[in-house]
């Protein structure tokens, strides 16, 4: 199926343009199934869980293929029986059943809703992604005419003040972004997006190895089996529609978004519907989202850059993008700029011009983009970040030097954000995108091998659920600070953070290294970090009397 160029679509067609894509790629890119049923069939079904209430609300749209009433006295409806069954996915053990009767209208779709209790439900979490199978059987004149099944999980995702909660407990999101629609433009994409083992390594194995529990599906959805993998192995998702720049009439947008919720709404991994990327749309934010919230009340909605200022009580969360280094792209006089606006890389207490809103907001703040320091897979700076690398490394930096700077920079920015405990989640940009584009991902060489760049090594540490960071500006990457005096005292804080629901304690070993990597002093600092908390641990180092470079 080929639609043609993006510009040929009619004005009412819902969807947007992505200004970081080059081509419009229409056509079928997910599985298509042909099913054989009777004349009354399940068109759509949602199994919406409530772990707290130990029940599942099942919403169905039943499609009748019988012809409409043609003559006076002809049937307008048919009496049917609907059997609902819930089973454990792995064992097949039936945990609950219910039967209702209804009358689907002929040549139409009819809505039915029922609630099914579950005794002792097993919760779905990233650490224990337990799945159930929901089944709907349709009987017409006591004859089975359709059977429809989906997987789902028993989990409650909500918010409490500025924080997300999973199954009633505070939950911090840690992870990255997937821009699959951009990756489709990559000359090395080929059939990788439909290779289950490749996708599992990308979406499950690598993220879990570096302490990620979340991913944002960014500027366009992915094939259904990607969501299945996240359901099965435990990665939570912010699922974003194809919306950056506006396109489409309101009624068509309603149709597309409503179908989206029905289509993807059974996946327990999807905990946030992301309606817009970096934009504002009053119809979506204040009319459509409240309407769709009634269809699916089990998830949170994000409306791009819209906040409580535009949405009032409809605002459930915000998505700030603290790209602190963006100025390096726009300023032609970087040295003068940084004299007035120094960027103290490594100083975790450092403020940022856009940080005040994050601190003052009353809803969860999910930083789902940051890290304006992209490279292509061959180690060259991307289109947007050439000036970054030229400023810090010079114009002749090697790929290895660029990768090491990128990795270290991302570590320190991650530490900076995680140190602000009112931020409810941190998703770096970007885990997968098209090569040779405006941005970049953190793989090197051939993408089919998913060979990690040095950034992954640092991510493992800065994304650890319990971690300790050094709150100290790195003098190697600043031009506005004078060297410290040999033999002086250096006072700073260690910052301990804990995303877990239990107290974490241990000892921190602090070493001072010379330029050859030799330890010239060492001290131990005991530290205790409360659950979901932060601990500042003051430290004092006596600097060497010999001038030189130290770490």
Model regions and ranges:
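Secreted/periplasmic carbohydrate-active enzymes, especially glycoside hydrolases
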Residues: 1-217, 237, 256-259, 271-272, ...
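Substrate-binding/catalytic cleft of secreted carbohydrate-active enzymes
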Residues: 199-202, 214-447
